Swiss-Prot record:
Its main location: nucleus. Coiled coil: none annotated. One of its GO terms (cellular component) is nucleoplasm. Residues 102-154 form the bHLH domain. It comes from Mus musculus. Efficient DNA binding requires dimerization with another bHLH protein. Binds DNA as a homodimer or a heterodimer. Forms a heterodimer with TCF3. InterPro entries: bHLH_dom, E-box_TF_Regulators, HLH_DNA-bd_sf. CDD domains: bHLH_TS_musculin. This is Musculin. SUPFAM superfamilies: HLH, helix-loop-helix DNA-binding domain. A motif (Nuclear localization signal) lies at residues 66-71.
Amino acid sequence: MSTGSVSDPEDSEMRGLQRVYPAPASKRPPLLRMERGYGSPSDISSAEEEDGEEEPGSLGAAGGCKRKRLRGADAGGAGGRAGGAGKKPLPPKGSAAECKQSQRNAANARERARMRVLSKAFSRLKTSLPWVPPDTKLSKLDTLRLASSYIAHLRQLLQEDRYEDSYVHPVNLTWPFVVSGRPDSDSKDVSAANRLCGTSA
């Protein structure tokens, strides 16, 4: 039993050492992650390996998105080019200038035609006046003044009762519408009409 007595103190010493110094990690039982609260280095390395395996896939997906975006941008650029090609080209500046010049020419032609019609109307009014020398050159303003004085003279003849029996034909009037054989008082009225008409050479 001597051996047993010798072994007992050694066993007690070994137990004391085990209490003071914990067992190495290789001999300790593995703990769950929930109990430890953090992952062991081996778990971290395995997680990193899994992340490393997943990252190429994620990069590939991002690359695919970028490629899709680039393709969409290329399609949009092609659509913009197609839309730009569908627009009508602007006319050259020379054609615009020619169009404006043609419009000016048309407006000038219309104005010349209007002036011709107006000149014909004034010439007819001048010939309708009773006795105007043919060599007399009258402006448009003088023609209008003579016509207004002639109309005023005819109205005066119609309003006066004393000329009912002795009707004076306009042909007997002399330019500028002076009635021969009329009294002096009537000649004053005619002179006032002459002042309205004005003298013309």
